[in-house]
Amino acid sequence: MTNNLPPGTPAPANPELLLELLRYPMPFGKYKGRLLRELPTYYLEWFAKKGFPPGKLGMLLQTLYEIRINGLDYLLDELAKRR
């Protein structure tokens, strides 16, 4: 399925992706077992500098990083309240 958005237009947000940020645990490292949403911003900044891991985890961490640096945490807060 292709979208009809002009080039350079970001894709619409996937609500399932946001829900995964609420329930996906960090699988390794200092914060192993903590939900991604609970990770401190400095940890996400470190990944942004060093490189996000490949695959789904990296995509989720990068999404969370973008949410944080753009002040969009309220999106996750609202979703968490509705759960």
Locations of the language-model features?
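DEDD superfamily 3′-5′ metal-dependent exonuclease/proofreading module
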Residues: M1-R83
